[in-house]
């Protein structure tokens, strides 16, 4: 069925969102979700340091149950706000037999269409808070004109200090960049 301005509160470690508009169809075996939303607020305290305001969200996704497990496939999602525009696709799978209560296995890839370099840290997960905090202080200016990112592996091991456990990659072309590696050093301009 169709829904408008739907809100889901965060609970039990799961994220929440408000302002969702789209359609949903499915049953206990699986289903499909389509979003065409404006003015979405995404809350995931366990993942991001603050709620993310999304001006435009368009997505197609599907899910299916296999025994005790769940798989969610994002066919395509496009998110945009004043700070960035990204596209993402990929799969998340629960790991119900994991001995460590893993948050799941993921294989996501995305493209950064545009982003304000000073805002990039706002979109990085809590698992790399130290890197995110450094970027907050070090990135002084710039526009990301083209970028890509990948996240693949068992999220229990994130941020993947052992490369055999997973991959997290962010690459970008930055125009008008200004970076201050260390407070005692002069800033570098590009």
Q: Can you say where each PLM-predicted feature lies in the sequence?
A:
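Short, surface-exposed coil-to-beta transition loops
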Residues: 20, 85-87
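Short acidic-glycine loop/turn motifs at beta-strand connectors
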Residues: 28, 96-97
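A short acidic (Asp/Glu
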Residues: 11-12, 85, 183-184
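Extended amphipathic, helix-rich lipid-handling scaffolds
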Residues: 1-11, 22-30, 34-82, 105-179
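Secretory-pathway-linked proteins and extracytosolic
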Residues: 101-103
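Short, intrinsically disordered, charge-balanced linker/junction segments flanking boundaries
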Residues: 178-190
